[in-house]
Amino acid sequence: MKNKFKTQEELVNHLKTVGFVFANSEIYNGLANAWDYGPLGVLLKNNLKNLWWKEFVTKQKDVVGLDSAIILNPLVWKASGHLDNFSDPLIDCKNCKARYRADKLIESFDENIHIAENSSNEEFAKVLNDYEISCPTCKQFNWTEIRHFNLMFKTYQGVIEDAKNVVYLRPETAQGIFVNFKNVQRSMRLHLPFGIAQIGKSFRNEITPGNFIFRTREFEQMEIEFFLKEESAYDIFDKYLNQIENWLVSACGLSLNNLRKHEHPKEELSHYSKKTIDFEYNFLHGFSELYGIAYRTNYDLSVHMNLSKKDLTYFDEQTKEKYVPHVIEPSVGVERLLYAILTEATFIEKLENDDERILMDLKYDLAPYKIAVMPLVNKLKDKAEEIYGKILDLNISATFDNSGSIGKRYRRQDAIGTIYCLTIDFDSLDDQQDPSFTIRERNSMAQKRIKLSELPLYLNQKAHEDFQRQCQK
């Protein structure tokens, strides 16, 4: 019997204990809603990013990569509208001083109340008054006036802090792709349709970050801007919708029961979007946005053309047409997806004799360690370390564990998602060239004896079987 963690606090405590995440600047009492990734968190994040890149870039004939700078010319943000419009409606409770985003306050009160993203302060206030939405913290209805708060982090480039040297940490990776559209298209001799993918850090001075790593002020995005002719926009949109859903289930291990699609009604659409659908996941705090797909029309390239006075049109050599390409944008936050995967995968499993274990049921490609090498007793440590070195030479992510009883070591590895435990025993000494060992599988706890030379084939076969099982769910 498997039971999920009941609260976010329980899950976070486990992840901190075993080395996935740590509170930022913890020796100085931390920094609110900032997290550092420990050894296991780094491995898991890198595996997730590599898995995404493989699926949406490497395996695609029409998608290439880009790594644009975090700090861009401020005119980029002027053209995109971020300088003037990238803000959240901020409201405070006069009674308890709690602070909220007005739009999220309304949404949490009743998700069926739809209000446009670019609504005025007066429109937000009217909804709050009409529905008498009180403070969730103290239950009082005593609000300040709503004011808008710009989310961009401002800093200065150079030694003089004046208006001429103001720059911003990027709030999204997308604009770095748009301003490089022509560079990529020309240098790679690309013909529409094609996509440009990027994984990188973004920064937003969020009013109310929280829910662990769900919403933080520093985060990573995995995005594609797919450029195309207007007529094919909805077909490409649907293609990505299906591909993303399949990938979330088969590669990331998310259950369809914990996923749902939310299409933004017209009044909720961003100013650049003609259609947006979010995949929402059932986090421990409830259903929230996980992975978005937006049809951005030709808005972005058009506004950059207007301000820069540079030609960002595309000339179709076959039809002799010249036009500004339209864009489909699939976008996901690394940390948010990581949180969904960890929520889905981590259980407390009841075993026989009233025993229990924490089981992190991560997919093979995501697991920080595929193998833990364990000597049965300490006198076998040298042989175990020799085999451990040979496994590392096979480019297999592995760890060495010789602390505590073999049972405790099994439990420790189960709790961090390690797929297999290899136990080096006295029979392993019989063949110096091709030693054998016991291999224990994480989920079933079944054990089998194999030789070192058989290990790569065994792992590939098991990974394939795991993938097939997930696809059949």
Swiss-Prot record:
**Quaternary state and interactors:** Homodimer.
Q: What is its EC number?
A: 6.1.1.14
What main location does UniProt list?
Answer: cytoplasm
Keyword match Repressor: no
Per the UniProt record, the source organism is Ureaplasma urealyticum serovar 10 (strain ATCC 33699 / Western)
* GO annotations of cellular component type: cytoplasm
Chemical reaction(s) catalysed: tRNA(Gly) + glycine + ATP = glycyl-tRNA(Gly) + AMP + diphosphate
Q: Which parts form a coiled-coil structure per UniProt?
A: none
Q: Which domain of life is it from?
A: Bacteria
Q: Which residues bind substrate?
A: 101, 172, 219-223, 329-333
> Know the name of this protein?
Glycine--tRNA ligase
Alphabetically ordered keywords of this record: Aminoacyl-tRNA synthetase, ATP-binding, Cytoplasm, Ligase, Nucleotide-binding, Protein biosynthesis
Instruction: Give its localization.
Output: Cytoplasm
- Keyword Glycoprotein, does the record have it? no
- What does the sequence similarity comment in the record state about its family? Belongs to the class-II aminoacyl-tRNA synthetase family.
Task of the protein: Catalyzes the attachment of glycine to tRNA(Gly).
Q: Which residues hold ATP?
A: 204-206, 214-219, 289-290, 333-336
SUPFAM superfamilies attached here?
A: Class II aaRS ABD-related, Class II aaRS and biotin synthetases
Q: A biological process (GO) annotation for this entry?
A: glycyl-tRNA aminoacylation
Q: Which GO terms describe its molecular function?
A: ATP binding; glycine-tRNA ligase activity; protein dimerization activity
